Amino acid sequence: MILKTIGDILKVSNIKKMLKFAVEEKRIIEELNIPKESFLPLIFSIRFGGDWSVVKNSESSIAVKEKVTRYDENKKIGYTLEKIYLFLNPKILSKEGTVYRLEKCGNEKERKLVKRPYKITIDGKTIIKAELDPMSNEIRIKKLRGPLTFKGPVAYGISHEMEHLKPSKEEEKYFWEFKWNLLTDAKNKSFI
């Protein structure tokens, strides 16, 4: 299976497409006039999915993804638009609320319990928004002015990536520290 996949990738037509994509990627970075390293979280988010962060010298950057699904009930078809926000030298201006959740980071082996803000306001030296549109096969990109405010999953992602830039000193609790509780109808009628 792997050999077939590698063989497919090595087709001349695919190599040409990948080279064209890489040349366009380089052109975009140059037009945005930002350091290449600062653009890496956005590239990783596009290529591999998820949220990313990078620290290089005194520069830091994070990319967080927001997914928006649009679905036509009548036609029974839809798509998920991915909005990726890149912040260069991000700064948290405010946090609101607390959400307890289980998370697993790419370099962790297991999930752990964390506290994240429900709402977060963030600014950066430069803010770039990229939209990956599966219907038009386009990656639309533009600079934004901050600050920006996010709620829910994007706020959690920002908080998580900022922790990579400045690690938290909070005590960690892993999922295996939870207790099992088998519920029966007699014990808990409200359990669904």
From Swiss-Prot:
InterPro entries: Peptide_deformylase_sf, Put_Zn_protease. It comes from the Archaea. This is Uncharacterized protein Mfer_0076. It comes from Methanothermus fervidus (strain ATCC 43054 / DSM 2088 / JCM 10308 / V24 S). The lineage of its organism: Archaea, Methanobacteriati, Methanobacteriota, Methanomada group, Methanobacteria.
